[in-house]
Amino acid sequence: MAGCHRMSAQALVRLLMVAMSVVVGGLADWSPLLAAPQSSSESTGPVIVGRILYRGPVPAPTQLQVNRDSDVCGTTITIASLSVDVATHGLRNAVVHVDLAIGEGPARTVESSPAVVRNTQCRFHPHVAAAQIGDEVQIFNDDPVMHNTNIIVENSTALNVAMVAGGNPIKKRLKKLGLHLVKCNVHKFMQAYRVVFDDPYFDQTTETGQFSITGVPPGLHRISVWHETLGVMEKDVQVPARGTVVVDLEYK
């Protein structure tokens, strides 16, 4: 979702480091113009894998009464704030991100598919997702009733569009970093989350809490984990030039 956005101090430092390495013939091994041919494993760098766990009590799902468009939405909506695999304690829908240390090199450029938000049976699908700044988001209404997609970032409206039944999808570029709260003003119980980063070093946990992040530059980096109910936790990890780093983190 490319768009004009103010360059952060970290991004400016990275840019200056790139310029200096080109001028002095430094170690810009990641540059396709300067680097010698590499194998696929060398070019992607190390892999960070792990699991996000939760061993605490899991609250029972909440049942909400539906008082509008119940023929499509149903008479009740089930809201489950935590999804935990009983066998492994793996936590689903946690977003894991590697915060690069300043001066560790530029963010890797990757091709990304459009981020899709679907209004289906009066729910946003997916409920949680992560994306990169500049990615395209495509919003669909699959229901025979009108919806409204209202995206809020830092208490400001980033997007507010009506989604008529049978209408064309809305296509926009993500231009704001951070946590995006997605709501429907027509059906107040509809809510979802998008987390937008300025680099591709992120992943979302599976049903068993697993994640995998590739191509991270070597160095001491901070891994941050976000969950809609449990909040944020962090851990500093030393990433080698190659190989696999295993990081398991647990919400208490």
Model-derived segments and their meaning:
Residues R14-D29:
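Bacterial N-terminal signal peptides
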Residues Q10-L12, L16-M17, S41, P200:
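Hydrophobic alpha-helical context, especially transmembrane and signal-peptide helices
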Residues M1-L12:
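N-terminal secretory signal peptides that target proteins for export/translocation
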Residues L34-K252:
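Extracytoplasmic copper-binding redox domains, predominantly the cupredoxin/blue-copper superfamily
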